[in-house]
């Protein structure tokens, strides 16, 4: 091939490569704009403003998982009963399947914005409450629940009040969520709190005999312990306690443990 043909061939390849790069750039730009539109409510379902209440007939459950931005109230009663209140078009999309004794409060797959969803639950027994995201759960007035497990992943909040004869309380917080206790747990023996992130366990009123507190990150724990307090902190976490327990601590970082009463 002579020199002129080689030059023309090189120019063609260079122009074809530039054209391909432009096509890819345009495609990526369109994809980015489409994603932005989705996150900016372009493809999200919004509440229609038609507020209604509905009773749900569900299989029996003693474990509850909240996976949406909703307000949930859980109380104890002889018979199970569930009432939901909110935008009619949102309630229609609520999942109602119970699997292995657990009801996951979630909407069908999709994007949702600007809606109301309130759930009132009455159950005879409660073993586990989980929250993912920014929802709010209030648990009130339970008797004779030997073990209660609570977990938060995200920025949500779980509030507790009026528990009697609960022996063991396990709390798991991942993220910036809060567990707040407003009232004494009669007969509570053991407390196990594990915080990963900046979440808080704020429950001075909940008195316990023995507590294991593990914090990784900057979380805070406020508790009342009478006998043994085991502490593990990695980071800047803080533990403040009432009572006169024997304290065993292992701290890595700037974290601290302090008696405050």
Language model feature labels by segment:
Residues 6, 20-29, 36-91, 104, ...:
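Short acidic/polar N-terminal linker immediately downstream of export determinants
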Residues 1-17:
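Short, Lys/Arg-enriched N-terminal segments with co-localized hydrophobic residues
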């Amino acid at each position: 091939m002579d020199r002129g043909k080689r030059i023309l061939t090189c120019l063609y390849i260079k122009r074809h490569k530039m054209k391909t790069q432009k096509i890819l750039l345009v495609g990526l730009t369109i994809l980015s704009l489409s994603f932005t539109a989705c996150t900016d409510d372009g493809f999200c379902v919004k509440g229609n403003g038609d507020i209604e209440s509905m009773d749900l007939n569900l299989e029996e459950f003693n474990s509850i998982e909240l996976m949406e931005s909703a307000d949930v109230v859980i109380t104890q009663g002889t018979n199970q009963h569930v009432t939901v209140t909110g935008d009619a078009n949102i309630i229609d999309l609520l999942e109602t399947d119970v699997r292995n004794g657990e009801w996951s409060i979630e909407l069908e797959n999709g994007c949702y914005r600007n809606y109301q969803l309130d759930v009132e639950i009455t159950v005879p027994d409660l073993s586990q409450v989980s929250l993912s995201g920014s929802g709010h759960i209030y648990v009130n007035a339970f008797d004779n629940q030997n073990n209660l497990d609570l977990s938060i992943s995200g920025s949500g909040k779980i509030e507790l009040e009026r528990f009697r004869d609960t022996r063991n309380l396990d709390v798991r917080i991942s993220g910036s969520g809060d567990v707040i206790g407003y009232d004494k747990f009669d007969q509570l023996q053991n407390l196990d709190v594990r915080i990963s992130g900046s979440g808080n366990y704020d429950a001075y009123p909940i008195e316990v005999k023995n507590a294991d507190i593990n914090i990784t990150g900057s979380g805070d724990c406020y508790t009342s312990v009478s006998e043994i307090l085991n502490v593990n902190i990695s980071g800047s976490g803080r533990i403040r306690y009432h009572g006169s327990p024997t304290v065993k601590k292992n701290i890595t970082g700037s974290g601290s443990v302090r008696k405050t009463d």
